[in-house]
Amino acid sequence: MKKFSLSGSRVFSSLAGTVLLAAGLSASVPARADGNAEPFTPLSEPGSAGLGAVARVGPSPYREGGSRHDVLPLYLFEGEQVFLDANRAGVKLLNGGDQRLDLFVAQRIEGFPSDRLPASLTGMAMRDSGIDLGLSWRYRQPWGNVQAEFLHDAGNTSKGNELRLGYSYDWRSGPWRLSPSLSVALRDARLNNYYYGVRGSEAAAGRPAYAPGAGINTTLGLYGSYDLSQRWRLLAGLSATVLDGKIKDSPIVQKRVLPGVYVGAAYDFGGHEPEWAKEGSPTWFKLLYGKATDDGCHLLKIVTAQCLSTASVNATSIAGVQVGKTFLENVNGWPLDFVGYVGLTHHHERGLQRNGVQLDLFMKAFYSGFPWSDRVKTRLGLGAGVSAAQRSPYVEASSQAANGKPTSRLLQYLDPTLDLSLGDLIGSRALKDTYIGFGVSHRSGIFGASRLLGNVNGGSNYLYTYIESAL
């Protein structure tokens, strides 16, 4: 897929990267126990942004854990200095063609399942996913790519360290790409003991105390993609991770070899000259205020006008600002634009819990091809991306607690809106690019199917009104 350069967008790129770094540091969600999501990060050139998802099927490493079905949302951004790759965000310290050095934070995709805890783990303290601070070096040559990464648990979850060494080879032919890879992960005792050990206080019949200590895991993978069009790409992969023998000997581990199958798709917003790099490209500023809906007033009911009322009991509210830059205009000649946004929202919890803030990064499509838009321009918008909350909003925390389900500070974000040009309404040319409207601020965990998002089945909806203007 063709990419474009963002030499004119460094300020926004840096802002986006800063937001995602903060989001990664503030998020703490359980995830699967088999390693790295990086093979499914199809963007490589500055100026690329993308959205997608990958479904994975594979066995749990834990005894009686059964098979796991997981959805990994792909939130992708490749700026000149910063990047977002699925479960990691970072800064490029060196990007010199054949060599690249990154400093990053990453969500460790490892830990006990939070939705269905197997009997073998009953009575044990939860082994949570952690946030790693890492340094990555890559060296690309025609004969292949070598990579070395050092990761340290920055959130004191396991207090462990890991060194990863890998080799991969990129084969391309027309729209096809295949990438076989081999990697080894040297894990210290703290990391392995946390995720695969049994503490003395957790020992039980058939589950003696055990500490595997340091060890080496090996992963063999084959990942591929097919370009359906300039921007749509199909993704697939196979992998097999061989756990260290001392991990396999743990009384809570059932398998030494963990296979995985992956299928997905991604959309690349590259392929055009960036609108924000053009002279006079506007910056969008949006102010919003809204209130929470009742628990049963879900997004589908709202967008179909079956539920348009806010909560009458424990009515919490939000106020926020969003800043955006246009990525694409008039896609394929249609009245369809794509705008990338960074948003900051304050939650007023009315004394029910401490107030908090929420960071959102999302791409939004605007359709304006209505028959009356030549008289009163009307935009129907739908945004999709990622949301990181300082703490789970009261609406989410209370609903999940009532159902005995976990919460997650990191969730999927959707932002459907409908607005009208204020200038067209009142006959003011100066306000032609100022819009008033209403929308829904929606956070959710993809129906409990994504362990990266904490297996949350539920979320929150806030009905809001707003004013947005291009400056």
Locations of regions flagged by a protein language model:
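Short loop/turn motifs that connect adjacent beta-strands in outer-membrane beta-barrel proteins
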Residues: 33-48, 81-98, 140-143, 172-178, ...
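Cleavable N-terminal export/targeting peptides
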Residues: 1-50, 64, 204, 210-215, ...
